[in-house]
Design a protein with these regions (language model features):
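Conserved helix-to-beta-strand junction in the class I
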Residues: 1-4, 68
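N-terminal accessory regions of S-adenosyl-L-methionine
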Residues: 34-38, 44, 90-93
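Ligand-binding pocket scaffold of soluble enzyme catalytic domains
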Residues: 1, 10, 116, 120
Length: 127
């Protein structure tokens, strides 16, 4: 709840990053218990409140927010490539890490890349 013109931050876990890194990267889709949680055609993970956490795609978030009187200010991939190369990032020296951060901030709102992020931040202003 916020007043008119207030800013709302909503955080989400991304479907695609989980599919790539865990379901494929760790082979989890070969296990029946994980197969049962994933649509075999769309690869959309089941997102039921009974699950540990819910995974979202942008269309899910848009549908969820469509009923509220808000204007989107930013749709941001908060970790983008970082989770895919966590050890590499941890081992960067200060100079390379600074360049990496500049790269991250240059791409974190690109609509063609946000869906690959493990975590997404949606920022709205209440109308």
């Amino acid at each position: 709840m916020t007043k008119k013109d207030g800013v709302i931050f909503a955080a989400y876990c991304g479907n695609e990053a989980t599919m790539v890194q865990y379901c494929f990267g760790r082979g989890m889709l070969k296990e029946q218990r994980y197969k049962d949680l994933v649509d075999p055609v769309t690869f959309k993970a089941s997102s039921d409140p009974a699950e540990l956490f819910q995974l979202y795609r942008k269309e899910d978030i848009d549908r969820l927010m469509s009923i509220f009187p808000v204007t989107r200010l930013h749709y941001v991939g908060t970790d983008m490539a970082t989770n895919y190369m966590r050890q590499t990032v941890d081992e960067m020296d200060d100079e390379l890490f600074d360049l990496y951060l500049r790269y991250h901030f240059a791409i974190c709102e690109r609509s063609d890349l946000v869906g690959a992020s493990h975590h997404i931040l949606d920022i709205f202003r209440k109308d």
